[in-house]
Amino acid sequence: MSGHSKWANIRHKKEKTDAQKGKIFSKLGRELMVVAKMYGPDPETNPKLRDVIAKAKANNMPMDKIMGFIKRAAGEIDTTGYEDITYEGYGPGGVAVIVEAMTNNRNRTAGEIRHIFDKNGGNLGQTGCVSWMFNRKGVIVIEKENFPDEDFVMEKALEYGAEDFASEEDVYEIITTPEDFSKVREGLEKEGFTFIRAQIEMIPQTTVRLSEEDAQKMRRLIDMLEDNDDVKEVYHNWEEEE
């Protein structure tokens, strides 16, 4: 299996502050409510909801909080008009950037995203301008500290249909096709595994490095995008040097 992880190398590495964690919970809560309202509040019959629950758990959201958001969706809360939108563009130094958002006002969100790109040495492009540089894959990350038997983890991952397996310094990374992601994740959950990340992502086919000046701009671009209330995920092909 793969010994090198592109995913691990292009994550924007930093400890989240309490305020940032609170914003992540707020965004996940909205996603839980919208998916529960649109497709039903029962995870057994709503596979999209199961996937969002798994993502929330991987971000350390307590189960009672998760269920609280789902229950709110069954009430009078208005989730009409929300839609998923993907933006593509270039960061400083020609870094390819994909932004996934959930919004009930696409004009507002597009304007805000464009402003963030412009302010940090990038530019928002047309749909399809960079997505061809990425592969859509399921990504499941497990901490080695909790499951030290690498052979067992790899055996189970492959048994449930994983496409690739990588052993990194302190984590295992399991890659799946988008179609098999839920099956692999649910199989591993039944085996007792817990995850620090579990979702479908855009993984770059190749990565680029930046000068220190452009790297500082890129960090600001990522921070500002992630801080936007409508943004769910930011993907890029910048490989940050250690």
UniProtKB/Swiss-Prot annotation:
Region (Disordered): 1-20
Gene Ontology molecular function: DNA binding
Keywords in alphabetical order: Cytoplasm, DNA-binding, Transcription, Transcription regulation
Statement: the UniProt record of this protein carries the keyword Cytoplasm: yes
Biological process, per Gene Ontology: regulation of DNA-templated transcription
Chief location: cytoplasm
GO cellular component entries: cytosol
Family annotation (SUPFAM superfamilies): YebC-like
Record flagged with keyword Transcription: yes
Pfam families tied to this protein: TACO1_YebC_N, Transcrip_reg
InterPro entries the record matches: Integrase-like_N (IPR017856), TACO1_YebC-like_2nd/3rd_dom (IPR048300), TACO1_YebC_N (IPR049083), Transcrip_reg_TACO1-like (IPR002876), Transcrip_reg_TACO1-like_dom3 (IPR026564), YebC-like (IPR029072)
Subcellular location: Cytoplasm
Highest taxon in the source lineage: Bacteria
Family classification: Belongs to the TACO1 family.
Alphabetized HAMAP family for the sequence: Transcrip_reg_TACO1 (MF_00693)
The protein's name in its UniProt record: Probable transcriptional regulatory protein Csac_0964
Organism, scientific name: Caldicellulosiruptor saccharolyticus (strain ATCC 43494 / DSM 8903 / Tp8T 6331)
Lineage: Bacteria, Bacillati, Bacillota, Bacillota incertae sedis, Caldicellulosiruptorales
